[in-house]
Structures are given as C-alpha cells and as structure tokens.
C-alpha cells in the first residue's frame, strides 16, 4: 500500500545535489487527513524520500532549539 500525500505549500529548499534531489521544508497532507510540516528529501520527479513530519508545536520547539544552538555557536565555524 502506497502512502498518499498532497503538497499543500512549499516553504523552501535547504539544499540540493547534482542528481536533482532536494531537501525541503513544506506543508504536506498525509493520507488525506494529517497536515504536517515536513522536512525531507524529494527526488526530481516529486517523490518523497526519508524525512520527518512535525506538528506546529514541534516546529516552534525546533525553532527555539535551533536558535539556542546558533547563539551558543557564536562566531565558531562548524
């Protein structure tokens, strides 16, 4: 059984590679009922690869954690 999805909104691409795959943050409806923030790799034909889905609350928490990490990094090049 194949999982159904509908790409509701493209938020942005984080990276892409020479073979055409992109790592993107999007809003996706999974199985016709679950709308989630979605961070994953997509192939050039629009087929999803491995990734994670996040609720609005999880996305906010991730934003906070990333902000804290960036502040701790300061001027370090990592």
Task: Write out the residue ranges for each language-model feature.
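Positively charged, low-complexity terminal tracts
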Residues: 1-78
């Amino acid at each position: 059984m194949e999982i159904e999805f509908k790409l509701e909104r493209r938020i942005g691409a984080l990276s892409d590679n020479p073979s055409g795959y992109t790592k993107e943050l999007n809003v996706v409806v999974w199985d016709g009922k679950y709308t989630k923030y979605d961070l994953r790799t997509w192939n050039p034909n629009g087929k999803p690869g491995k990734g994670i889905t996040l609720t609005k609350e999880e996305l906010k928490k991730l934003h906070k954690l990333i902000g804290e990490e960036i502040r701790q990094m300061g001027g370090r090049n990592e």
